[in-house]
Amino acid sequence: MTTIVCVRKDGKVAIGGDGQATLGNCVEKGTVRKVRRLYKDKVVTGFAGSTADAFILRDLFEKKLELHQGHLVKSAVELAKEWRTERSLRKLEAMMIVANESEFLLVSGSGDVIEPEFDVLAIGSGGNYAKAAALALLRTENNLSAKEIVAEALKIAGDIDIYSNHNHVIEEV
């Protein structure tokens, strides 16, 4: 369980996640890094779900990025197709948000590759809280950057969701 949120504002895309890993009802670690840079630091990914499954998917996505020379949409679609059709991958329990400087997408094991409608995507147990907070901040007149909106949304989600904490990693592309 976790919170991953991605926001686009003023030509910048920021993605962030909390650091909590749980095993059953216990917090096992509070400093897990769920947001990572890939493909020459031009792509950022954030994962929610089983840690081992997320690492498998991240590695597969990185291979797709290399194969398709960093083309985000093509790589995400190819990953979703393989994830959906490859028997050994079908049972992986994770979701991911992938982003570059101009696009970001939600990729799921059910074959979904979704571009956001309102410049916000969020996944994980705290995803709905973070999405609502980010949307509210985007719709309010303020001088907050995409990165600052992500930070505030993660803070709010961490206050509400017991499976998310306040140890955040935020990357901007």
Swiss-Prot record:
Primary location class: cytoplasm
GO biological process entries:
proteolysis involved in protein catabolic process
Q: Where does this polypeptide localize?
A: Cytoplasm
Coiled-coil segments: none
| Record GO cellular component, one term | HslUV protease complex
Give UniProt keywords alphabetically.
Allosteric enzyme, Cytoplasm, Hydrolase, Metal-binding, Protease, Sodium, Threonine protease
Q: What is its EC number?
A: 3.4.25.2
According to UniProt, the reaction catalysed is: ATP-dependent cleavage of peptide bonds with broad specificity
Q: Out of the domains of life, which is the source?
A: Bacteria
The active-site annotation reads T2
Self-association and partners: A double ring-shaped homohexamer of HslV is capped on each side by a ring-shaped HslU homohexamer. The assembly of the HslU/HslV complex is dependent on binding of ATP.
The UniProt similarity line reads: Belongs to the peptidase T1B family. HslV subfamily.
Classification via HAMAP family:
HslV
Sum up the protein's function in the record's words. Protease subunit of a proteasome-like degradation complex believed to be a general protein degrading machinery.
Q: What is this protein called?
A: ATP-dependent protease subunit HslV
Task: Give the gene that encodes this protein.
Answer: hslV
